[in-house]
Amino acid sequence: MPEFVALSPNVEVIGQTVLAVVDGMGAFRNLALEILKRHGVDNPNPEGWYRQQLWLDSFKEIYERVGKSTLNLIGRKIPENAKFPPEIDSIDKALASINVAYHINHRGGEIGRYDFTKLGPNRARLVCANPYPCEFDLGLIQSMARRFQPVGRTPSVTHDETQPCRRKGGASCTYLVSW
């Protein structure tokens, strides 16, 4: 599944998630709004719905103009802007909830998924089969892990290079989380 290409032309993403692009670009907020506008997302409303492909086109331009580290920052902002189930109180529940939140914040067709697997008491795996870029998903997972990290533990998130990668034409990317 290629990066930056929606799985269905009818998929939409909620505006509060789109606004993560603006928040993730920090001092370059105006550039983010300009890029979004150029791709058909003018003055996004947190409660509005926008075609996912327009948002992905904006991501691609940000990647090409500003760099992949900005996509990571945008991913890190998602937990601050997206709707998540209220009962999350541990790193395991937080990581497992990414798929639920992903489906709450998208509608209109096939969107892909985030598959969570607990590998041990302090380890987990997430397989991300969606059209978002690797760096974005890495930032999203890092943010969720840090937000719900156990006291005295520092989470680590790595892209599993032994597994397929969307950037290299794979259908998914795999991330390993330890804490």
Task: Label every model-predicted segment.
Residues 1-65:
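N-terminal leader/assembly segments
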Residues 17, 26-28, 42, 69, ...:
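Compositionally biased, intrinsically disordered low-complexity regions
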Residues 21-22, 75, 95-98, 157-158, ...:
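Generic hydrophobic, helix-prone segments enriched in Leu/Val/Ile
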Residues 25-28, 47, 67, 115, ...:
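Serine/threonine-rich low-complexity intrinsically disordered regions
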Residues 40-135:
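Amphipathic interaction/junction segments at domain boundaries or subunit interfaces
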Residues 107-130, 134, 150-179:
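Short terminal or interdomain "cap/linker" segment that borders an active site or interface and mediates
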Residues 135-150:
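Short, non-transmembrane amphipathic alpha-helical segments
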